[in-house]
Amino acid sequence: ILNVGKTGFAWLTSAEAIGSVVAGLVVSQFPKLRKQGLMFFVSVFVFGLATILLGLSKTFGLAMIALFLVGAGDAVSTVIRNTIRQLQTPDHIRGRMTSVNQIFFMGGPQLGEVEAGLVAAAFGVPFSIVSGGIGCIVGLILVVWKWPQLVHYDGHETLPAPATAD
């Protein structure tokens, strides 16, 4: 990959984890995060944009930066998502909610990898990576459009329950 040899490949495979650890350490320094909704959406946007950057990168340095940002964006969004889920879920269903989250957390990425592999086989690896980043940002825009109040979530307010079909 990028003709960087074994050592370069090792650094590339570590860059995302390094970004996650650094972001996790930074976030842990704030006992009470403000503007959680905005921070969540910014971190998901960074994740998507960095994924696009990775797909377009032709140099080792740019790929390292992109992967570092992918890891950082993912770590921050995961921390905030888990915090919101814990604070907003009623006590009597928190265990079930956590179980559902774990199913998606453990199974979702593997399904995404199958999709990415199929797209890469049909259109090439760079297209697969770039289209994944674009899909992330498009999904983010759709969520903001459908639930704009989430952007303003600050940890104090109760989020409205989703509408049910009658």
Regions found by a protein language model. Name each.
Residues I1-D166:
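C-terminal transmembrane bundle of multi-pass solute transporters/carriers
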